[in-house]
Each structure stands twice: as C-alpha cells, then as structure tokens.
C-alpha cells in the first residue's frame, strides 16, 4: 500500500498541481455539510476548480456516523456523475464516506483515484486503509488496500477555525491512536517511530491548543494527527477504541470523547506505571472530556459491547476483573 503525502502550507498548491497534471476533468467531492465552508475550504478550493475547468459533483448527504445505506447512495451518485477522481474534504466522517464509495465502486469494477484533505486534526483517516460504517446501528470497520487514499493533503489552515470542543475530541483521538500504536501487540519499529513522533507533537501541545489556540500549535496538532494515523495504519487500535464504539452509537459521545473515557484506565494497565491513570484522568478533564453517564442505558451492558477485533490488539488480555475495575473507574473517578 503506497500513498503520496503532502504536508504543511504547500499542500494546497500541491493539490492544485496534482489536479492539473493528471488532468482531472470530473471530480466527485465528498465534503462536510457545514464545515466545508466554515473552515475556508470552499473559498480556497472553488477558484482552483474553476481555473482548471473541473466539473464538480458534490456529495454531503451523510451522517456524522456514516451509515451503509448512505454509502450505497454515494456509490450510485458517484457512478452517475462519471467522475474520474474522488476528493474527500472534511473530518473523519467525510474521509470514511469517500473511502467507502471508492471501495464499493471498485467492487462493481469501477476504479478511481482517491485524494483526501482533512479539515480536522485527529482521526488520521487520510493515512489509513480502514473505514467506519454503521450497519443497523452497529459500528463496523472495513479494511482493504483500496480504502487507503492514493494521496493525502494535510493543510493545517483548514483546522484553524475548529472549536475548542472539536479540537479536544479530535486531538485526543489522535493522541490515543499514537499511544495505542506504541503499546500495541502488532507494533513494529516503523509504527513505533510514527507513534513517538505523533506523541511528541500532541501530548503537551493539545491542552494548550484547546485553551489558547495559535496557528503554530494547530500546525503541530495537524502533523501529529497525520503521524498517528500512519502508526495505526500498521498496528490498528486497542482497548480504548474497542470500548469506545458503544459509547458513541448508544450514548452519543463524539468518537474522540468516547475514546477518552477509558483511555486513562488502559494507559496505566498497559504501560504498568502507577499514577498514569490519575495523570490522564486529569488530562482529559482539563480538555473538557468528562464522563457524563450513559442516560437510560446500562453501563455494564455498554462495556460488554466491546469490539473484540480491536481488543485483541491490546498487549494485556482484558478479563472480567479488569472489566469490574473499569466500571468502578468510570463511576467513581471521572
């Protein structure tokens, strides 16, 4: 699996050059519904499309947690548009939707180029060969080589307008990915290098970026998110992500927030350092990711809806004793 990545201030011009050199004639743009305009992407990209004479078909009719029926609708609209390239511009949802459309179109014999340009700093979806889709309310992770975008364009200015809450949620998702790649059963020398690079760009910068954002801080967070994505593209995620899915699908926690709920507990368990749970409990509270209960749902049942595939990557097998302690942690510490 190979990908060309353009990182930093020159990524926007690199996108223009790639669109021009191919050349792209019909573009299927998978984008966020409101974020595309709010982050400045529309103002930056529309002149490029006009200049190059590219016919653009937009697709934005999908949920924050993309559903299979929405992906199927996207595939049909992509086929009808006769586009030669798919460009995803948005957060994790837009990335996943574009990846799913390319994948399922390929199953019908229609192959195309996929480009990805994130407008949030966190999911790292522009750098992975996984895509998330919800089938009858349950989260599924689709994995295939053609899900990895052919090109990633990480242009930090598109993240400059992200709210504090969005910065916290997506940024912590990236930080968790980096740590989960680091302690992963599948860790390699390459993935560990990516994970450590991501941690160095995220750990101390994220709380400051949430409280007092600056463009240089956001640049670091965007780069950290990309390298975290590169790391989990090799290792996949572990327990914090495995337990997060039901908190999102059943209780409505945003993905990064859901990951943060159990991360402190597993950080201490997996790294074996006393006090680490308390450190990260304070950390997630500092950036506003607190535990707000599970509404009418039963917490024990939520915890037992764990994703066993991701849980299998955890370096320490999770048993019922751990589950009881995790339940106690959530109800007494956060």
Residue spans of the language-model regions?
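A short, small-residue-rich loop immediately preceding and capping a beta-strand
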Residues: 78-119, 243
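A glycine/threonine-rich phosphate-anchoring loop and its flanking beta-alpha core
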Residues: 104-190, 277-279
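Short glycine/serine/threonine-rich phosphate/pyrophosphate-binding segments
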Residues: 12-15, 38-40, 68-69, 93-100, ...
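Active-site segments that bind and position negatively charged phosphate/pyrophosphate groups
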Residues: 181, 185-282
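Acidic, glycine-rich active-site loops and adjacent beta-strand->loop/helix elements
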Residues: 63-65, 93, 101-104, 119-123, ...
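C-terminal charged capping/lid subdomain of soluble metabolic enzymes
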Residues: 276-334
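ATP/NTP phosphate-donor binding region
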Residues: 1-85
């Amino acid at each position: 699996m190979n990908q060309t990545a353009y990182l930093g201030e020159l990524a926007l011009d690199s996108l223009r050059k790639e669109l021009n050199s191919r050349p792209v004639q019909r573009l299927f743009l998978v984008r966020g519904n409101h974020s595309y305009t709010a982050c400045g992407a529309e103002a930056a990209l529309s002149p490029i499309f006009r200049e190059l004479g590219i016919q653009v078909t937009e697709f934005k009719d999908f949920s924050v947690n993309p559903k299979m029926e929405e992906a199927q609708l996207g595939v049909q609209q992509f086929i009808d548009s006769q586009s030669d390239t798919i460009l995803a511009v948005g957060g994790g949802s837009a990335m996943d939707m574009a990846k799913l459309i390319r994948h399922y179109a390929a199953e019908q014999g229609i192959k195309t180029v996929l480009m990805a340009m994130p407008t949030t700093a966190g999911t790292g979806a522009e750098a992975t060969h996984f895509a998330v889709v919800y089938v009858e309310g349950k989260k599924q992770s689709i994995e295939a080589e053609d899900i990895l975008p052919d090109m990633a364009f990480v242009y930090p200015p598109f993240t400059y307008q992200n709210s504090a809450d969005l910065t916290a949620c997506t940024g912590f998702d990236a930080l968790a990915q980096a740590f989960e790649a680091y302690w992963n059963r599948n860790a390699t020398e390459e993935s560990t290098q990516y994970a450590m690079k991501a941690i160095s760009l995220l750990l101390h910068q994220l709380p400051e970026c949430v409280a007092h954002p600056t463009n240089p801080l956001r640049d670091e967070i965007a780069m950290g998110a990309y390298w975290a994505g590169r790391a989990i593209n090799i290792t996949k995620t572990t327990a914090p992500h495995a337990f997060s899915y039901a908190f999102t699908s059943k209780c409505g926690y945003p993905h990064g927030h859901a990951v943060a709920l159990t991360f402190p507990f597993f950080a201490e368990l997996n790294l074996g350092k006393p006090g680490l749970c308390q450190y990260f409990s304070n950390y997630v509270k500092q950036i506003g990711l607190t535990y707000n209960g599970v509404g009418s749902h039963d917490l024990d049942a939520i915890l037992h809806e764990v994703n066993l595939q991701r849980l299998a990557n955890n370096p320490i097998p999770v048993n019922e004793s751990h589950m009881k302690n995790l339940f106690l942690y959530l109800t007494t510490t956060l």
